[in-house]
Amino acid sequence: MGKYYLAVDIGASSGRHILGHLENGKIELEEIYRFENGMDHKDGKLLWNVDRLFGEILNGMKKCKEQGKIPVSMAIDTWAVDYVLLDEKDRILGDTYGYRDHRTDGMDAEVAKILPETELYAKTGIQKQIFNTIYQLMAEKQKEPELLQRAETLLMLPDYFGFRLTGNKLSEYTNGSTTQLVNPTTFQWDTDLIRKLGYPEDIFLLLQMPGTKVGQLLPEIQKEVGFNLEVVLCGSHDTASAVMAVPQTEGDGIYISSGTWSLMGIESLKPIINEEAAVANFTNEGGYDHRFRFLKNIMGLWMIQSVRHEYKDAYSFAQLCDMAEESKNFPSRVDVNDPSFLSPDNMVEAIKKYCQKTGQPVPESVGELASVVYRSLAQSYGETVSSLEKIAGRTYDGIHIIGGGSNAAYLNQLTADATGKTVYAGPGEATAIGNLLAQMIYAEELTDLKSARQCVRDSFEIKTFVPAK
């Protein structure tokens, strides 16, 4: 039996601890622990309970001990853009806001007063999203300036959890890149930009690459979980880890990291920053080994998850797909990236209102709603492919769908049909796998990214969906 590695993969709706090891050149996975996640509604704010999340991280580690499977290392990935501010005693200042909170409303205009959006894109190559850290910090500066003044350190959430485990503060690059405050040429914070915006530059720690050691567990953590290990940086932005696990050795093709969000793009050795990319709202996020994830953020399965929730989770996703197929001729489509779908009080009403506003038939049944969502998502993928190929100046043969959404066979087929390209679906646990790959390369069990991706290809089933003739 090979050495165990622990991936702690925390998404916006759930978290999981997955143990991985190599056996006969293949990666074996075992889910050890899973827990629910979600933003808390408190006094009209959407917040993360980081103490609860840290407790869940420890709970999963204890499960490893209970099962007698002690990992040699662990790494943590989460969603992007959210952070904590720490004071001089390393206590959290203020609330830990979630990216769907409305405090950033109007903050793009405030940032644009200091730096026009075209200049900001030229500097960072990052897609404008109202929840990006740059806008969250502007909200902080405008509404609670004393917190920024008192802050000693800014840590993105996975870095904060790493600090709680080891006592060492490190800032990881891939997640840092999503803040819209990083220079894509230097792979470090853009101090000129930070100064211009009036943010305190000394709170930003030097960015470190995936594959960097964070440290050993603190003595009190060792005592609580019953063992020691090394904490290592993976691509701590979950999409960076997921893209690492695309089972294509050259990394040369279109991918969709499909989950609550759909991140659709290509891997590039250089950032693609030009007017066309800016207008199409593509982003250049940091990836493993100094690569760039040139991609577009698409609303993803959030809409269907929300619709299901409105119906009290009475239907499984498989049932929703069947009902959508029964209503496949329902003609209405929505722009899945419309801001009205980001954080509505009621997703079903938001979809109906959009159809009404755009003069389309209003969906009434669950099947009609599901059909609108799935087909609109596939249509968005088709438009994104056209845009991507135009900007990249080339065509691509296939699309790799990774992550939880790769299990949605119905959507995979719609995607093949909408794009006219063969879809390769899997692995579903791409984020955890990418997290593990970074640790295995660090431990020299795998040599590099190319061999790691070949290992993914050899280890997991990939399903194929061909466009309908």
Tell what function each PLM region has:
Residues M1-G94, A122, Q222-V231, T419-K421, ...:
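N-terminal glycine/serine-rich phosphate-binding loop of ATP-dependent small-molecule kinases
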Residues L6-A7, L19, A112-T124, M138-A151, ...:
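Active-site core segments that coordinate phosphate-bearing ligands/cofactors
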Residues I70-T78, T153, L206, R394-G403:
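Short glycine-rich phosphate-binding loop at a beta-alpha junction
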